[in-house]
């Protein structure tokens, strides 16, 4: 519920009970997962050495704490049988008006969803010529990440825009250079920017023309003012 100047004594604002985004009232969660399941490549069937991940794909969905159970159940209906919860820790909170009232939120949440085999996982592990792990390489990746804010070089386009730095960390962990990253709810284009900077091919879908135009003309432009072209990053 939104109130004028944030005070319920002033009555509801004109934005109360309104959709934040065009798709808020007609977003079909099950159609969304059906769409994503068709885009995601099939699980890798090749055997892997003990203690290593497969080259299977995964899907990462940012969500609120309360949405997690609903998403897990919907994902299972479309073949995403497993999940790993992810937490992102911020050193700031948008709940400034509540700072003297209660504990404020300073986290974001996501679900890593996958079908049956653990997805591709890159933690710096190196393999020698005999296929053995090189001691001292590889490190634990916790299920929580620090939320690094972007600098002024990254335009602010979407209210729910994610940090390019955070997205790059996730992309580096679950893909290799040359892999394909797809964002079905592209918004600001931050995912495409992160993928392209890491030499991954990237595709995005966005139904809002305003966000699409701004992402194309602001986010997907290099500091040299040479606009990124998707074709430049798609492997043949």
Residue map of PLM features:
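Core catalytic lobe of class I
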Residues: 1-205, 210-212
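Class I S-adenosyl-L-methionine-dependent methyltransferase module
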Residues: 66, 220-236
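Conserved SAM-binding loop
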Residues: 215-216
């Amino acid at each position: 519920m939104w109130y004028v100047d944030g005070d319920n004594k002033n009555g509801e604002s004109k934005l109360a009970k309104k959709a934040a985004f065009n798709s808020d009232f007609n977003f079909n969660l099950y159609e969304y997962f059906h769409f994503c399941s068709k885009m995601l490549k099939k699980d890798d069937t090749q055997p892997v050495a003990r203690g290593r991940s497969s080259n299977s794909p995964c899907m990462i969905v940012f969500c609120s704490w309360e949405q997690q159970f609903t998403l897990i159940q919907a994902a299972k209906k479309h073949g995403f049988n497993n999940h790993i919860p992810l937490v992102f820790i911020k050193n700031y909170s948008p709940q400034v008006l509540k700072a003297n009232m209660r504990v404020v939120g300073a986290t974001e949440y996501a679900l890593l969803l996958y079908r049956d085999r653990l997805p591709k996982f890159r933690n710096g592990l190196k393999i020698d010529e005999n296929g053995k792990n090189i001691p001292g390489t590889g490190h634990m990746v916790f299920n929580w990440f620090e939320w690094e804010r972007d600098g002024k070089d990254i335009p602010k386009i979407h209210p729910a825009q994610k940090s390019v730095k955070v997205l790059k960390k996730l992309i580096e962990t679950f893909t290799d250079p040359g892999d394909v990253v797809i964002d079905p709810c592209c918004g600001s284009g931050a995912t495409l920017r992160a993928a392209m900077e890491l030499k991954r091919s990237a595709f995005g879908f966005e139904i809002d023309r305003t966000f699409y135009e701004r992402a194309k003309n602001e986010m997907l432009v290099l500091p040299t003012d040479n606009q990124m072209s998707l074709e430049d990053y798609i492997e043949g």
